[in-house]
UniProtKB/Swiss-Prot annotation:
Keyword set, alphabetical order: Ribonucleoprotein, Ribosomal protein, RNA-binding, rRNA-binding
Protein name: Small ribosomal subunit protein uS15
Domain of life of the organism encoding this protein: Bacteria
GO cellular component terms given for this protein: cytosolic small ribosomal subunit
Protein task: One of the primary rRNA binding proteins, it binds directly to 16S rRNA where it helps nucleate assembly of the platform of the 30S subunit by binding and bridging several RNA helices of the 16S rRNA.
Transmembrane segment boundaries: none
Organism of provenance: Nitrosomonas europaea (strain ATCC 19718 / CIP 103999 / KCTC 2705 / NBRC 14298)
């Protein structure tokens, strides 16, 4: 199931740096993580959906690049974000 507008708005409110912030790396990574988690659930039921799997891999790659950027600019924010999203073990 796709991520709804309400879910996106909630994620933006939770991860924004200041009111109205929708473009910071933290918000973008959080939104991508929400979409990735939604697709992972989709693939549990639709194993042979290879076309969507390509989109998933593209999103994972984009999230990785944003995380690398955030790590190079603000390591403390990077560590807080991955802890909050539960991305690293």
């Amino acid at each position: 199931m796709a991520v709804t507008t309400d879910q996106k708005s909630q994620v933006m409110r939770d991860y924004q740096r200041a009111a109205g912030d929708t473009g910071s790396p933290e918000v973008q990574v959080a939104l991508l993580t929400t979409r990735i988690n939604s697709l992972v659930d989709h693939f549990k039921q639709h194993v042979k959906d290879h076309h969507s799997r390509r989109g998933l891999l593209r999103m994972v790659s984009r999230r990785r690049k944003l995380l690398d950027y955030l790590k190079s600019k603000n390591n403390d924010s990077y560590r807080a974000l991955i802890e909050r999203l539960g991305l690293r073990k």
